[in-house]
């Protein structure tokens, strides 16, 4: 956040971060959502970057027995020592597996309140109704599973049901699982998803796991899951867990449908997705993500059809600019934003305002920013006079 605020955005607004192991992205997503829902902010840029591919990190996870080592993979596939193997199949969520593969990732999203998104004509890729967080309570081992993730998944499912209805949850939803590729995860997470599906009357709950392709980027991993979900709605394909040929025997599956092959899906047939993240130490988080067509339906109900007509008109230019930028970036022809020592604000940029009684009531930073109100209301006002 420091680098982005100081050298990319020149941001003077609220900033902050949460660190929650592998659930870090969702913890920060929740922080941005709460700031917008409370009216504290109208826009929030949320994201994480993780670059753990260093000898020290590899050694630490290897000591834990969490990584898919070459020797383990050869043993898993009944190969002789030194034999070559397909390293692209190293991470096998919910299959016969032996650990995860570390990855680098940087994922950022822009959240806006309803009115601002419509006013700007922003590309609406989906929406997040909430992120639910629960710890595990007392634990036998800090790395062991607990009850917390059952609670977060159940809450996320309940939130989806309250918005899109019981039938849509049962027939038109999907789960982006944490799916690390470890034996412990395949047992614990499948049990959680299977139990919640049973309690909510869901049969054949579709389960995807993007780590099969990109590995485990730790703090950014839920960002990978979110991007995969948004891509599902943009391109109409559910990514299959194609590193797995068959599920492991200890995977719970009575109420689940693990998507092992790419599955073409009409973008309008999945209304909601649940993202699940299980962070080391009991940092459990699950998010409810609504499809673009559901988001637009909600916006039309709240703001009226005229507002939506105006939005689609504004969006034409935005969508064209977005496509042009994407094409340029894909060609390697992108413009780097880096404002080092550019537009630095000091005391001379501050202008304080006062009421007619001389009470300091506002401060403005620079000429192009609106004044900041200093006449703050507090529930404790006057109690200490």
Predicted segments with their positions:
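Conserved catalytic cysteine-centered active-site region
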Residues: 1-31, 64-67, 71-101, 192-224
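Conserved small-residue
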Residues: 25, 32, 61, 110, ...
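Beta-strand segments within the central parallel beta-sheet cores of soluble alpha/beta enzyme folds
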Residues: 15-20, 41-49, 123-132, 166-177, ...
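Active-site-proximal alpha-helical scaffold in enzymes
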Residues: 5, 15-50, 100-122, 216-241, ...
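A glycine- and small-residue-enriched flexible loop/hinge segment at structural boundaries
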Residues: 1-14, 344-385
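Conserved beta-ketoacyl condensing-enzyme motif
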Residues: 1-15, 35, 49-60, 162-187, ...
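Active-site-adjacent elements of ketosynthase-type condensing enzymes
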Residues: 26, 52-90, 134-155, 180-192, ...
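Condensing-enzyme catalytic core mediating Claisen C-C bond formation in acyl metabolism
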Residues: 72-174, 291-358
């Amino acid at each position: 956040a420091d680098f982005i605020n100081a050298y990319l955005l020149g941001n003077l607004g609220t900033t902050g971060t949460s660190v929650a192991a592998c659930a870090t992205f969702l913890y920060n997503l929740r922080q941005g959502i709460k700031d917008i829902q409370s009216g504290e902010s109208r826009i929030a840029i949320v994201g994480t970057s993780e670059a753990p591919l260093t000898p020290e990190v590899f050694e630490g996870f290897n000591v834990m027995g969490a990584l898919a080592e070459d020797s383990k993979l050869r043993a898993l596939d009944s190969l002789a020592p030194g034999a070559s193997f397909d390293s692209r199949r190293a991470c096998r969520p919910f299959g016969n597996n032996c650990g995860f593969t570390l990855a680098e990732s940087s994922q950022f999203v822009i959240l806006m309140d309803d009115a601002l998104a419509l006013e700007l004509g922003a590309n609406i890729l989906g929406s997040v109704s909430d992120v639910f967080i629960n710890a595990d309570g007392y634990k036998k081992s800090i790395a062991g599973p607990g009850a917390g993730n059952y609670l977060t998944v159940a809450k996320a499912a309940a939130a989806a049901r309250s918005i899109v209805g019981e039938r849509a949850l049962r027939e038109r939803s999907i789960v982006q699982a944490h799916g690390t590729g470890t034996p412990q995860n395949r047992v614990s997470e499948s049990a959680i998803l299977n139990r919640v599906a049973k309690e909510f009357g869901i049969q054949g709950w579709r389960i995807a796991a993007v780590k099969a392709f990109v590995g485990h980027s730790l703090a950014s991993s839920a960002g990978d899951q979110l991007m995969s979900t948004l891509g599902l709605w943009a391109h109409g394909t559910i990514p299959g867990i194609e590193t797995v040929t068959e599920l492991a025997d200890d995977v719970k599956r009575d109420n689940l449908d693990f998507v092992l092959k790419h599955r073409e899906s009409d973008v309008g047939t999945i209304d909601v997705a649940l993202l699940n993240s299980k962070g080391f130490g009991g940092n459990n988080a699950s998010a409810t993500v609504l499809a673009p067509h559901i988001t637009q339906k909600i916006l039309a109900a709240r703001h009226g059809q005229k507002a939506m007509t105006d939005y689609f008109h504004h969006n034409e230019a935005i969508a064209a600019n977005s496509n042009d930028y994407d094409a340029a970036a894909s060609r390697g022809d992108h413009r780097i934003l880096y404002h080092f020592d550019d537009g630095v604000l000091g005391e001379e940029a501050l202008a304080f305002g006062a009421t007619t009684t001389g009470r300091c009531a506002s401060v403005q930073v620079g000429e192009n920013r609106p004044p900041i109100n200093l006449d703050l209301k507090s529930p404790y006002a006057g109690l200490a006079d």
